[in-house]
Structures are given as C-alpha cells and as structure tokens.
C-alpha cells in the first residue's frame, strides 16, 4: 500500500482551516498530520512531523505567511510549500516565489482542483493559478535572462513550465532523471533564482 502524503495546514482562520482539513481528509491519498493557527507553531510542528506538503496562508496575525515561509526554509524544512490565499497582489506573488514557495493558489480554487493540485505539487510540479499566470505575463524585463541558457537547458525549462516532474521531463527528452537535475541546477544558477517556480515565472515573463 502506498504511503499517504502528509499534509500540514497553517492558517489563522479557524473556519477556513477546518474546511480545508475536511476536504483534504476526504481523499485517501492524504493524511493531515496537523492544522495550526500560527506561523511559529507551524515551523515547530513541521520540524516534528516532516510533512510532504505544507499549505500556508499568506495574511496571518503574528508571524506573516512570508516570514513563516522564510523560517521554514531557514530551518531546513524541505516540504513542498503551497501558498493558499485570497491575495493576488503582484508584489506578494513575486516575493513569496523568490522566498522559496513551490506554488500559489487563490482561495477561490474549486475543491476538486485543490486536491489535484496538492497531488501535483507533491510530485514536484509547479502549481500556479491561471489568474496568477496571467499576472506574471504582465511583468516586463528589458533584458531576456533566458538568453544565457543552452538549448538543452531551455528545453528543460520549457517542460518545467508546463508542470512536468523531473521523471516526466526525463522521459519526454529521452535523458536520465539525474541529467535533468543537473540541467535544473545549472539553469537556476544562470537565472539567479532559487526554485523551479521562480524559473517558471521568468519563462512566462519572457514568453508573453
């Protein structure tokens, strides 16, 4: 039997937190290891439970979602972190992605869609709401940072941007999964970003 994906919920709104928990627990693929109301508690619980996915609210009292995200990464928590919030402010999106978020969904996401996106993010895919993608397309740069990539690195990035996992990219490009990881490390370094989500953002920006 396949192990369930461990999910940690961090949201200071009790009703929202309870609703998301009940939704996630309807799917046998998931186990909610904890649901907490503050970022400080969330960091502590994450270190104790080693979740696969953390669903994090942005606008929380006390430690903000951004500071919680930074704290989780600073403590070495390698869970996939999905921001689930009502905010679609551009600055919030850019800042959170740069800080190491693996996905960004709005709270008006359909329940079935949310469950599917949690599965995808756990598999290493990039998750962004369609409205978020549209916002990213509006951002402009004078220089194209993608020009520094080799053809192969660009091919890998193009696959990342479609939401494929490393294993799927390897199959698509007929290369090993380890080679995919090497290309990803190189392209992240060249683009001066720290996550595949941030690299995807650049891809969308330059391919309007």
UniProtKB/Swiss-Prot annotation:
DNA-binding region listed in the record: 166-185
Keyword field: Activator, ATP-binding, DNA-binding, Nucleotide-binding, Phosphoprotein, Repressor, Transcription, Transcription regulation, Two-component regulatory system
GO molecular-function term, one example from the UniProt record: ATP binding
SUPFAM superfamilies, sorted: C-terminal effector domain of the bipartite response regulators, CheY-like
Domain HTH luxR-type: 142-207
Keyword Hydrolase annotated: no
InterPro entries: CheY-like_superfamily (IPR011006), Sig_transdc_resp-reg_C-effctor (IPR016032), Sig_transdc_resp-reg_receiver (IPR001789), Tscrpt_reg_LuxR_C (IPR000792), WalR-like (IPR039420)
Xref: Pfam families: GerE, Response_reg
PROSITE patterns according to UniProt: HTH_LUXR_1, HTH_LUXR_2, RESPONSE_REGULATORY
Keyword field contains Translocase: no
Ranges of residues in domain Response regulatory: 6-122
GO BP terms in the entry: phosphorelay signal transduction system; regulation of DNA-templated transcription
4-aspartylphosphate: residues bearing it: 57
Function: Could activate the expression of a formate dehydrogenase operon and could repress the transcription of the fumarate reductase (frdABCD) operon.
The name this protein goes by in its record: Nitrate/nitrite response regulator protein homolog
Organism: Haemophilus influenzae (strain ATCC 51907 / DSM 11121 / KW20 / Rd)
């Amino acid at each position: 039997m396949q192990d369930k994906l461990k999910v940690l919920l961090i949201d200071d709104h009790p009703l929202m937190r309870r609703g998301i928990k009940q939704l996630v627990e309807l799917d046998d693929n998931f186990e909610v290891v904890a649901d907490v109301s503050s970022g400080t508690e969330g960091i502590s619980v994450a270190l104790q439970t080693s979740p696969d996915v953390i669903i994090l609210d942005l606008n929380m009292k006390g430690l903000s979602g951004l500071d919680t995200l930074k704290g989780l990464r600073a403590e070495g928590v390698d869970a996939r972190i999905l921001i689930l919030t009502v905010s679609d402010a551009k600055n919030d999106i850019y800042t959170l992605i740069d800080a190491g978020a693996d996905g960004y969904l709005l709270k008006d996401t359909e329940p079935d869609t949310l469950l599917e996106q949690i599965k995808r993010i756990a598999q290493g895919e990039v998750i962004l709401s369609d409205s978020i993608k549209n916002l990213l397309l509006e951002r402009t740069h004078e220089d194209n940072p993608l020009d520094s990539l080799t053809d192969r690195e660009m091919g890998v990035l193009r696959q990342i941007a479609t939401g494929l996992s490393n294993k799927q990219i390897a199959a698509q490009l007929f290369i090993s999964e380890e080679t995919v990881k090497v290309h990803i490390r190189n392209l992240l370094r060249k683009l001066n970003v720290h996550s595949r989500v941030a690299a995807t953002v650049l891809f969308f920006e330059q391919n309007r």
